[in-house]
Amino acid sequence: MAFTHVCLWTLVAFVLTWTVFYLTNMKKKATDLADTVAEDQKDGAADVIIVGAGVGGSALAYALAKDGRRVHVIERDMREPERMMGEFMQPGGRLMLSKLGLQDCLEDIDAQKATGLAVYKDGKEADAPFPVDNNNFSYEPSARSFHNGRFVQQLRRKAFSLSNVRLEEGTVKSLLEEKGVVKGVTYKNKEGEETTALAPLTVVCDGCYSNLRRSLNDDNNAEIMSYIVGYISKNCRLEEPEKLHLILSKPSFTMVYQISSTDVRCGFEVLPENFPSIANGEMSTFMKNTIVPQVPPKLRKIFLKGIDEGAHIKVVPAKRMTSTLSKKKGVIVLGDAFNMRHPVVASGMMVLLSDILILRRLLQPLSNLGDANKVSEVINSFYDIRKPMSATVNTLGNAFSQVLIGSTDEAKEAMRQGVYDYLCSGGFRTSGMMALLGGMNPRPLSLVYHLCAITLSSIGQLLSPFPSPLRIWHSLKLFGLAMKMLVPNLKAEGVSQMLFPANAAAYHKSYMAATTL
């Protein structure tokens, strides 16, 4: 018995000794890491390095600098970008922009006010405006369309007017890493010299073609769903420039919208398996023979104008990529380098600005960004808090894009017709869907409700006037299609984040209320 007691007490003493040693060692490592980064920050070094000075990088630089952070931004090309994406700012995005103090960046760029959609299908037209009487939305319920490059340059000027923001033109080659902690970047400056920059926090915000994403997440590979083809018709103005014109054409959707007082963006989706060549003229033939006849007469002249005048045709892959946090400390990824959804909902900038707003608020209490463990806690919190907005937009974009593809399958076409009927029926259906689309009501559960309502109404149309065996079969196929659209997004975004309303309520209270942050 005495021997047993001795063994037991020896074991207890060993466990206690090991625990004390482990905790002391962990504390020492955390202290050493903080001291190392603090040492790196001497002599005016940066608190934060931002890779990329697009919409996200510039907006984040401004927000963090206003909080007193020293920010070093490294951008590959400071010329005004010529992009086809990022030309439409939803009402929710404008709210986020104003909360960051950047609302004036939409001024003096000839941005056009947009009050909603005009939707066309099979010769019919209907309006789907943003809800005006929405007591839950604390900002003017309208969108803006513009030249992306002009907007980016405004953001850059605003950010780099602050004395604690340093802008440098250069190409980031890799992240500097030490024992699983990112300490900075290696980059080539404008003169072609390879150099390094150190900071306790590095933000990767270099867009959908990010060359740093793979070094942080092996499984973060973007999936190309289709291609968006577009061009600008110049020196013209739409009859209804305040609307984004969405045409449910075949093989997929077509969009026409005003991006300045004299320029109109024309674009359409092409599926990968049937992509016409631009070089040999197949694309122009495809546009004239397939797309143009489906464009409504009041839009057709402007749509043709760009083709006939030889407007530069741009092709952009429509990518999808779920967000995944990096296991490495001292780094966070934002924007299209972090999370992408189909661009048909034109909400990428809105999600990005929401992310910046959240990250800024979470970082504000931290006086020392060199504590990698505390910063990691902030990043983990950020990932959860962003879900109401990101999950709503991601699910809506990815589901909506599948519905808009034309098909000879009766079930798929019934779903497509059901979306048109539901979106354009007026009342709470239209206002509810447009509030979701515009980022005015980022509640995933509300989106699930509307998707289920569209499915049930589409099934009702299929079964009408009498539920024959063939109609029942098509209805079952339609239900299966709806589940294929919804379930993968539930899995990707998280069931709890999608179906529990408390998260959305907390997000709305913290980030969409009328009070400024």
Curated annotation (Swiss-Prot):
It holds the Pfam family SE. It is found in: Membrane. FAD binds at V55, G56, E75, R76, R83, F88, R156, V172, D336, M349. GO terms for cellular component: membrane. Its EC number is 1.14.14.17. Expressed in seedlings, leaves, stems, inflorescences and siliques. The keyword Oxidoreductase applies. Its cofactor is FAD. Its main location: membrane. It is a multi-pass membrane protein. Catalyzes the stereospecific oxidation of squalene to (S)-2,3-epoxysqualene, and is considered to be a rate-limiting enzyme in steroid biosynthesis. This is Squalene epoxidase 6. It comes from Arabidopsis thaliana (Mouse-ear cress). The gene is SQE6.
